[in-house]
Amino acid sequence: RGGVFLWPRVFTLDTYKNLLGQKIWVNAFIVSFIRTIVGTFLTVCMTCLVSYTLSRKELMFGKIYRFLVVFAMYVSGGLIPYYIVLKNLHLINTFWVYVIPSMLNLFFIIVGMNFFGSIPTALIESAKLDGASELRVLIKIVMPISTPFIATLALFSAVNQWNSWLDSSYYVNTEALRTVAYRMLVE
């Protein structure tokens, strides 16, 4: 009988065998996997560095920088100027067009600024009194207590990297660099 069923009538892996038998899909999985790992790692590193720096009250012109981050998030530059910038940086049709532009997500930076701004300044000042540099404070004190933020950031970034099809559609013409999300969209 016809109809919609909650469970499959017959369990089979034939579709996966068919899919993984096609080189184009295997390559798309490899590109997506590498993009997700590299992009997530670099996004977490850059976001932590930038958002920690911008969250510090003693940063010279800090209010201006924070305003520019929020302003840039609300006012986008547009697709054509963005494409021209990527072309001038020679990122079109390269793997790095996936990773480099996504390293600094302004939403992630704003969330990070709020998180790092909530860390008590007495904790940071006591480390500086003991002779710790800014980098040592960040690595030895701030990062260990920031694991909830880092885990959330890594999860959001990984999902964003894996599901992104737009950049593969606009900035990549080479079939070998297409991602799974793009393949699922066009096929």
Locate the predicted segments by residue.
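A hydrophobic, multi-pass inner-membrane permease signature
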Residues: R1-E187
